[in-house]
């Protein structure tokens, strides 16, 4: 796995005229009381030799239990505070957030205790209107919301549709 790189998908949908995005809340005791700035796009490590988009699709399915079908809109990359580079794509789609099936991971808890617990990658996912997503999402990933809006705006102008 490429240690400092990950890839993910930003699923979006229209709720009437309002754009909404799907974000996931990390599982486990460390994150249980954190909300603002804790949510993330479904993403994860890129396997050796794996195409980043294929990694993003795989991670989306592993972390949510949902399939994502293209077309995929490239959003470029961002660098998180940890130094990790995240490659992201947007995809329009819908799902029922109450039906999440997230893979589990093992983590040491409490830290340095040598005790390990199994936790879900995400304990829940939800659709957020863009304004609420800005508050909820990891600060470094907020740029992906702006890029999504830019892609939607430029696509609508190219098709002569104006605002949705």
Task: Enumerate the predicted regions with their spans.
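The catalytic Nudix box helix
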Residues: 40-75, 129
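Short, charged/polar surface micro-motifs in flexible loops or helix N-caps
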Residues: 15-18, 28-31, 47, 66, ...
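Alpha-helix-centered segments that form part of catalytic cores
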Residues: 115-131
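Short, basic, low-complexity termini and linkers enriched in Ser/Thr/Gly/Pro
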Residues: 153-164
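N-terminal strand-loop-strand
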Residues: 1-40, 89
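Active-site-adjacent beta-strand/loop module that shapes the phosphate/pyrophosphate-binding cleft
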Residues: 78-114, 126, 148
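C-terminal/domain-terminus segments
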Residues: 141-155
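A generic structural signal for short hydrophobic patches within well-formed alpha-helices
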Residues: 46, 133-134, 145
């Amino acid at each position: 796995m490429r240690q400092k790189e990950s890839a993910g998908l930003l699923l979006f949908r229209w709720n009437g005229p309002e754009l909404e995005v799907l974000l996931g809340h990390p599982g486990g005791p460390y994150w249980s009381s954190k909300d603002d700035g804790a949510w993330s796009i479904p993403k994860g490590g890129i396997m050796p030799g794996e195409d980043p988009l294929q990694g993003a699709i795989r991670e989306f399915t592993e972390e949510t239990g949902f399939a994502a079908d293209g077309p995929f809109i490239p959003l470029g990359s961002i660098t998180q505070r940890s130094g990790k580079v995240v490659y992201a794509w947007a995809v329009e789609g819908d799902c029922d957030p109450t039906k999440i099936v997230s893979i589990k991971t093992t983590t040491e808890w409490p830290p340095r205790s040598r005790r390990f617990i199994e936790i879900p990658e995400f304990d829940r996912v939800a659709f957020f209107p863009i304004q609420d997503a800005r508050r909820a999402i990891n600060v470094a990933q907020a740029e992906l919301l702006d890029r999504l809006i830019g892609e939607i705006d430029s696509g609508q102008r190219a098709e002569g549709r104006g605002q949705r």
